[in-house]
Swiss-Prot record:
Domain of life where this protein originates: Bacteria
EC class of the enzyme, as a word: ligase
Compartment(s) of residence: Cytoplasm
Residues reported in the UniProt entry to bind ATP: G122, S123, H124, G125, K126, T127, T128
Name of the protein in its database record: UDP-N-acetylmuramate--L-alanine ligase
GO cellular component, one term: cytoplasm
Sorted UniProt keywords: ATP-binding, Cell cycle, Cell division, Cell shape, Cell wall biogenesis/degradation, Cytoplasm, Ligase, Nucleotide-binding, Peptidoglycan synthesis
Length: 472
């Protein structure tokens, strides 16, 4: 590694099992650094880290730091994410011992400087677009390094250390840390107001994106997003699924169903070829086109790209089919923003009452089982949630997943139910008081041939996993 200020350091990750933290830990360990961590959970990422020889403490206790600092002293660096609170006992002990503490974004910024980096940012589609880029480059024999916010099917991991020149990484806008990154290519999928615990309005988010664009040598962005047109510089490389004239890269859909999307592909207004992708939905065409645009901007030949877009797979928890339970198909999805719900339901609707579907059997109804994520997001976007949930045939709401936030008075799933009914008075909608009651409610309110679409960024995925394990 070049420009390496951490060559003799030991990195200790507080909360190492998270999708972002575990990826960084994997890459550092495979590049020869000493790595340890702590996490209260026990998930597949923890097992993968242990397989790499990484020592993981089961509790986030002050004694972890005391034990490590006895051996490492000035060589020990503590890594945290924005999810780690200041009152965390392990972090408090690190401060007490005056240890060097870095945010995960500082580690990623360091890794980005080592390779030709393609950074994916935006409100929605980051993980899917990153996965597609990583898959294309992997299959095109580029052997990239990747740090992704989801499990990439091609590598069956959220991180991979390759021998090629490319590094693919997500640049998280949620806490503004993406302004630390100096990328070779910065890709922007879209931006709209979210993370209202950090951004007061859309203008503050746009200003952060503008800072990010100034740090990247090339910007590749989605022309179909009005906010990106405000945020991006004049020399932006644009892609679009709506128009091809005066656009650098375009894919205009010709056939779209629940099984495939066929589109006419253009470069700089000139028709090149048709492309077929196995990921239904306009948003997935957009994600795929963004990935193609990034690869082409990195001088990958289109002939090395096209053969691989027809067999793409989404990362885990992106419309992930889990199985069939009592005649009901189970799909798990990460959607937790109104726009993500809209796009996912639009995609699901393509699979209702048809055999042209990526699902194994035709479904009659879409049943959304939604776990709102964060009180602040629910409060600030409740009107949009209420509108977009109306595209389902039946809705079941769980309690709000706090993600570490304190409750906000009056912001509950019952409130979201009332707002949704005001927009959609004929929509069957139910709430459950506790997540453990959910299976019983699903059993009572749904029927055979329903598509059970579990949505949310919290622990709702555990319910879909539990039901899938009951499949005989």
């Amino acid at each position: 590694m070049t420009n390496n200020p951490y060559q003799i350091k030991h990195f200790h990750f507080i909360g190492i099992g998270g999708i972002g933290m575990s990826g960084l830990a994997m890459v550092l360990r495979q590049r020869g650094f000493a790595v340890s961590g702590s996490d209260k959970s026990n998930n597949p990422s923890i097992n993968n880290l242990k397989d790499l020889g990484i020592n993981i403490f089961k509790e986030q206790a002050a004694s972890n730091i005391s034990q490590l600092s006895e051996d490492k002293n000035e060589q020990l660096i503590i890594v945290i994410s924005s999810a780690i609170r200041q009152e965390n006992e392990e972090l408090k002990e690190a401060y007490e011992k005056n240890l060097k503490i870095l945010h995960r974004s500082d580690i990623l910024a360091f890794l980005i400087k080592q390779q030709y980096s393609i950074l994916i940012a935006g409100s929605h589609g980051k993980t899917t677009t990153s996965t597609i880029i990583t898959t294309i480059l992997g299959k095109a024999n580029q052997d990239p390094t990747a740090i992704i916010g989801g499990i990439v099917p091609y590598y069956n991991s959220n991180a991979y250390v390759g021998k090629g020149k490319f590094l693919i990484a997500e640049a998280d806008e949620s806490d503004g840390s993406l302004t630390k990154y100096d990328g070779d290519i910065g890709l922007l999928t879209n931006i709209e107001l979210d993370h209202t615990d950090y951004y007061t309005n859309i203008d503050s988010l746009i200003n952060t994106i503008k800072k990010f664009t100034k740090n990247c040598k090339k910007i590749v962005a989605n022309y179909d997003c009005n906010n990106l047109r405000k945020a991006c510089p004049d020399k932006t490389i644009w892609w679009s699924t709506n128009e091809f004239k005066n656009i650098n890269f375009a894919a205009i859909p010709k056939i779209m169903n629940g099984q495939i999307t066929l589109a006419s592909y253009y470069e700089n207004g000139k028709y090149i070829d048709d492309i077929s992708i196995s990921l239904p939905g306009v948003h997935n065409l957009n994600n795929t086109l963004g990935a193609i645009a990034a690869c082409r901007s990195a001088d990958i030949n289109f002939s090395d790209i096209k053969p691989h877009v027809s067999s793409l797979k989404c990362p885990e928890r992106r419309f992930q089919f889990k199985g069939i339970w009592k005649g009901r198909q189970i799909v798990d999805d990460y959607a937790h923003h109104p726009s993500e719900i809209r796009e996912t339901l639009s995609m699901a609707r393509l699979m209702i009452n048809t055999k042209k579907s990526i699902l194994p059997m035709a479904a009659d109804r879409i049943v959304v089982i939604f776990q709102p994520h964060r009180y602040s997001r629910t409060r600030d976007l409740i009107t949009e949630f209420a509108k977009n949930l109306g595209a389902a045939d039946l809705v079941i709401l769980t309690p709000i997943y706090s993600a570490g936030e304190e409750p906000i008075k009056g912001i509950t799933s019952e409130k979201l139910k009332s707002c949704t009914l005001a927009n959609n008075p004929n929509l069957p909608i139910f709430t459950c008081k506790q997540l453990r009651d959910l299976e019983n409610i699903i059993n009572l309110k749904t029927r055979e041939n329903d598509l059970l679409l579990f949505m949310g960024a919290g622990d709702i995925t555990k319910v879909s996993e539990k039901l899938s394990k009951k499949i005989k």
